[in-house]
């Protein structure tokens, strides 16, 4: 399935120095977002900062949203994750995509201009309405929570 989403380039380096976001393979779910910095940025352990991507999107379709997710290599190798864990972009948002970056590692990390820092995934949305009830129909699991389904 392919859906058209409006994209606004806010930084002239996109499309010249850095490519537009694109799927790396036919099976890719996410497109890489880059740090559109003017100079290298060093994050000390525990630091968080908002990093511009130089892009704005307008999804328009209320049946879709976008999520900003971490890149696995940055988190595993360097302790660089998203400060808000997951970024949710609503269909009616039109501003610049910013990435909250958190250095949860033990060493300084220097981010370079144009470095791939996160990925953008477009996802379907279901807007639910609630039906108030006094009791639920009994399920096999019931109220069992954290760890109740076992480890094996």
Curated annotation (Swiss-Prot):
Protein keywords: Hydrolase, Magnesium, Metal-binding, Nucleotide metabolism
Pfam assignment, any one: dUTPase
Q: Which domain of life is it from?
A: Bacteria
Biochemical pathway: Pyrimidine metabolism; dUMP biosynthesis; dUMP from dCTP (dUTP route): step 2/2
Which SUPFAM superfamilies does UniProt cross-reference here? dUTPase-like
**What does it catalyze?**
dUTP + H2O = dUMP + diphosphate + H(+)
Requisite cofactors = Mg(2+)
Q: Name one GO biological process term.
A: dUTP catabolic process
Task: Cite the EC number.
Answer: 3.6.1.23
Annotated GO MF terms = dUTP diphosphatase activity; magnesium ion binding
Q: Where does substrate bind?
A: 71-73, 84, 88-90, 98
Q: Respond yes or no to whether keyword Coiled coil is given for this record.
A: no
Q: State what this protein does.
A: This enzyme is involved in nucleotide metabolism: it produces dUMP, the immediate precursor of thymidine nucleotides and it decreases the intracellular concentration of dUTP so that uracil cannot be incorporated into DNA.
Q: Which family does it belong to?
A: Belongs to the dUTPase family.
Name assigned to this protein:
Deoxyuridine 5'-triphosphate nucleotidohydrolase
Q: What organism does the record attribute this protein to?
A: Aeromonas hydrophila subsp. hydrophila (strain ATCC 7966 / DSM 30187 / BCRC 13018 / CCUG 14551 / JCM 1027 / KCTC 2358 / NCIMB 9240 / NCTC 8049)
Q: What is the lineage of its organism?
A: Bacteria, Pseudomonadati, Pseudomonadota, Gammaproteobacteria, Aeromonadales
Q: Which gene encodes it?
A: dut
């Amino acid at each position: 399935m392919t859906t058209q989403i409006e994209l606004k380039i806010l930084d002239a380096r996109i499309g010249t120095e850095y490519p537009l976001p694109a799927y790396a393979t036919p099976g890719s779910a996410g497109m890489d977002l880059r740090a559109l910095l003017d100079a290298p940025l060093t994050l000390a352990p525990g630091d968080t900062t908002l990093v511009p991507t130089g892009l704005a999107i307008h999804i328009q379709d209320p049946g879709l949203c976008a999520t900003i997710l971490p890149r696995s290599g940055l988190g595993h190798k360097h302790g660089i994750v998203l400060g808000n864990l997951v970024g949710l972009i609503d269909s009616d948002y039109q501003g610049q995509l910013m990435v909250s970056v958190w250095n949860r590692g033990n060493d300084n990390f220097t981010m370079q201009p144009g470095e791939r820092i996160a990925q953008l995934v477009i996802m379907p949305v279901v807007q639910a309405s609630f039906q108030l009830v006094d009791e639920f129909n009994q399920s096999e699991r019931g109220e069992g929570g954290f760890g109740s389904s076992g480890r094996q």
